[in-house]
């Protein structure tokens, strides 16, 4: 039963990056929308889910306080980790034997593309 906003999923991410709580929260919230919340296994949303990111600041980098180049680099790395984890969660979902990725191109907006992709992967008539 994984169809997040978020659903039956626990994700714990740690980093030694020096980043403010506000920037870390912003990065995680935006990334969860584009990774975990796009996963569906059976179309049912459950209530047991959580994603936590902890940063201890020990990397020695300049503190990330703004949405600058360092912040974008952090977001890119966070996206790579969360994308990999989200795909693993889908692949390991109850009864999963295949992993399908739906890519929508040339959409008018990201929101439209997401709605279309969710409609396609949510169809019970698709047989792979």
Positions of PLM-derived features:
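N-terminal loops that bind phosphate or other acidic moieties
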Residues: 1-112, 116
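Residues that scaffold, gate, or flank divalent-cation-dependent active/transport sites
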Residues: 120
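Conserved small/polar residues in nucleotide/adenosyl-binding loops
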Residues: 126-128
């Amino acid at each position: 039963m994984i169809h997040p906003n978020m659903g039956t999923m626990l994700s714990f991410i740690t980093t030694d990056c020096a980043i403010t709580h506000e920037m870390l929260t912003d990065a995680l919230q935006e990334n969860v929308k584009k990774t975990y919340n796009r996963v569906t296994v059976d179309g049912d949303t459950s209530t047991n889910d959580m994603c936590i990111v902890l940063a201890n600041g020990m990397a020695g980098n300049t503190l990330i306080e703004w949405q600058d180049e360092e912040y974008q680099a952090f977001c890119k790395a966070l996206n790579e980790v969360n994308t990999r984890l989200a795909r693993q969660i889908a692949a390991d979902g109850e009864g999963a034997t295949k992993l399908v990725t739906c890519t929508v191109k040339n959409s008018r907006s990201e929101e439209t593309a997401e709605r279309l992709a969710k409609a396609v992967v949510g169809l019970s008539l698709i047989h792979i």
